[in-house]
Amino acid sequence: FGNPFAYTVDPLWPVDLRQPNLQLPWSSDETWYYTGGPHGGWAAGSAWAALDFAPPSDQLGCVQSESWVTAMADGIVTRSDFGAVVVDLDLPGQPADGFAGTGWAITYMHLETRDRIAAGTPVQTGDRLGHPSCEGGFSNGTHLHVARTYNGRWVAADGAVAFNMAGWLSQGLGSEYDGLLVRGTISREACVCRDEINAISP
């Protein structure tokens, strides 16, 4: 297998790590709902890298949605299966190499098979990736689970490099799934509901 140390990335995280500009992962003419604060990026025990959002709907549970999940930044789709779409980000000075384990990548979970973008597809900010659903992992309601990785490691949504989507900054409240999104003087709290308290607009 050769020398494993020849493949190391040092440092794994630079001390001045900054998140690239990310947009909200849905159309600019829609309001979605913040239903889950910082929680495991991938199953129980993983870093609290993920946030959850539900599309606009009058229905509850696992129902088909015509809303689209859209790319938060330019990149290349490296995975599209089992409800997951992973996009390796294309950044100035750090172009996408097609590997989610290097640089920044975004994982979008619970995307329906119908209309889901294919692996290998280049995307630009705002391009359609698929529809939110209950596919891929446990879910009892149609939603999007979104998380960031850097060099293959989950980046905590409320850590030193807080999740920032179009100026909405993630703040944890100490318990899994509890959290705020704050933009300027506006604050929204995670809630398993669709209400003004958790409504997020571009």
PLM segments and residue spans:
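Short glycine/threonine/proline-enriched tight-turn/helix- or strand-capping micro-motif at secondary-structure
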Residues: 32-73
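Acidic, glycine-rich catalytic/binding loops that coordinate metals and/or anionic ligands
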Residues: 1-11, 15-22, 63, 70, ...
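Active-site-proximal beta-strand/loop segments in catalytic clefts of secreted hydrolases
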Residues: 36-39, 53-56, 73-74, 80-81, ...
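Short glycine/serine/proline-enriched coil/turn segments at secondary-structure junctions
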Residues: 42-45, 78, 136-140
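Extracytoplasmic
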Residues: 19-21, 29, 46-50, 72, ...
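Zn2+-dependent peptidoglycan hydrolase active-site motif and core
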Residues: 64-116, 140-143
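Small beta-barrel nucleic-acid-binding modules, principally OB-folds
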Residues: 44-61, 93-99, 104-106, 111-112, ...
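A structural signal for short beta-strand/turn segments enriched in small hydrophobics and glycine
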Residues: 34, 69-71, 75-77, 120-132
